[in-house]
């Protein structure tokens, strides 16, 4: 039987939930979560949208889910962002936790069990109503749903599954849905959610198992990697089934992602990039997110951050990650055990080029695509345009500027028809000084944050304020 058939989903669902979800309008746990006299829906929304802001592992996915005309919603392959502004601007993704209750006591987490913070939990029906009502008002295009662990992983995943199942079936919502898989939950629940969600993610939390055991003693690396492997195999199997069964249901069509906290444990950039590279290779992840550690708890195991969160380090990791995914670099080309951390003054690509000046200057009219990609100041689109344009004749520096090459960075590393743009010394110190003088524009806001989830409620937020680092 195909992996993604409705019959398989119904069979697996009934093994865990004896009564079909659509026949369960009232369940015992709903009263336990929200008895009469507890928080209103708007109070819950305020608490649980704010609690979700530390999870950065969501943004646009590139997936398209075309509505079939029988329901509501349509996923456009792009433009899915973090949240929306109080002025009605579509930032487009309702990003909330199902609950910030949690049985775990992770030292770095604001929602840890021992913290005295306002607690709240949605019901599946409340999640559905919020999503639909926000969608109808054109505030969002989709839903990002994560959660603390309520009672146990299976219990939490069943609640999440019920919410997503109702959205897709009862409410006929066909927009984008990104769901967090809970480590340690029953694999059948992961499989069933994968048939309904566009993207799933399992947070790695910390780069190494040692760091995880020290700061999150209730979590285990194996429990995190198991659902990641299951999702990867499910995606591969689903692609094979769709090739044979044209109408087979899709399984996590936008792929999976993960997130690592940077700076909470002493791992080097080299260790972090090696972990990321292995995740891309072994688990075929679409994206690894890096979150600069923000100190929200007082704990002796957590590092002191007199300079604030390591935002520049996070930025360099994202730049290096881009080089791994789109520029053909490998982690051990960028860093090594002898040079374990990125240069804070130079981006990783320029730093690599300066350490390999024997390969430069590159002759633009003859170099292969791979080498052109490695020139600082030349991006993927510019490299593709160069390869196409030079078929029609030799390119000059004026042509490169029109193509989109950043010449103030590239001029030290390229020639056109054997000539450099200006007489330039191919010396590391000289080029470094000139590159540093061209101050790099870092994606930090006025408050030093690399990203910002807009409030659902603050009416005094300037309309021009933008989210930094919000594209995928």
Q: Model-predicted segments: where are they?
A:
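Short Fe-S-cluster ligation motifs
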Residues: 132-147, 320
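Long, highly charged, low-complexity intrinsically disordered interaction regions
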Residues: 301-373, 409-461
